[in-house]
Design a protein with these regions (language model features):
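Conserved DxG motif in ATP/Mg2+-binding regions
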Residues: 26, 70-82, 119
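ATP phosphate-binding glycine-rich loop and adjacent ATP-lid/helix-beta elements
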Residues: 47, 51-54, 84-118
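Short beta-strand/loop element within the Bergerat-fold HATPase_c
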Residues: 60-77, 111-112
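Helix-loop-beta hinge of the Bergerat
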Residues: 3-38, 96, 100
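Conserved ATP-binding N-box helix of the HATPase_c
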Residues: 35-62, 67
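Short, contiguous acidic/charged loop-to-helix segments that flank catalytic cores in large enzymes
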Residues: 33-37, 81-86
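C-terminal end segment of the histidine kinase catalytic
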Residues: 125-129
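Short beta-strand patches within cytosolic ATPase/nucleotide-binding catalytic cores
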Residues: 25, 62, 107-109
Length: 129
């Protein structure tokens, strides 16, 4: 996935969210094509934050993807007047399990009105491990 294709994926999701009342914007800054395995993890993060944003009132979701030589960083920030705590907790538990399965370094912080994620998705090593 080159930068333009990944930006398109994130922009389409952002547009879908805006159409249902969630303010959303995404910025992708990559300089080389990304492996499908990396994009899959990024999309899981995007989708999980979109799910929480959809259930929240007055939600604002910002997404930023940046690449270095070893990995891709995704930062997601969600603000809301009343994020649905139970749904948020369940969704983030599932996201944590997925990130750990893929050996992704991450930090998720959440309270009743906001949530943030910083995830570092490594490039696959030769041999796919």
């Amino acid at each position: 996935f080159n930068r333009e294709r990944l930006q398109l994926v994130f922009n389409e999701t952002a547009a879908d969210l805006r159409s249902i009342g969630v303010e959303c914007a995404a910025l992708v800054q990559t300089n080389t094509p990304l492996p499908a395995s990396v994009v899959s993890v990024l999309y899981d993060c995007l989708y999980d934050f979109a799910t929480v944003a959809n259930a929240a009132s007055d939600a604002v979701l910002m997404l930023f993807v940046q690449q270095d030589e070893r990995r891709v960083q995704l930062r997601a920030m969600l603000d809301s007047s009343d994020a649905e705590s139970e749904r948020m907790a369940t969704t983030f538990d599932e996201l944590r399990a997925s990130l750990e399965k893929h050996r992704v370094e991450y930090s998720i912080e959440a309270d009743s009105s906001s949530a943030s994620l910083v995830a570092y998705v490594p490039f696959p090593t030769k041999g796919g491990k």
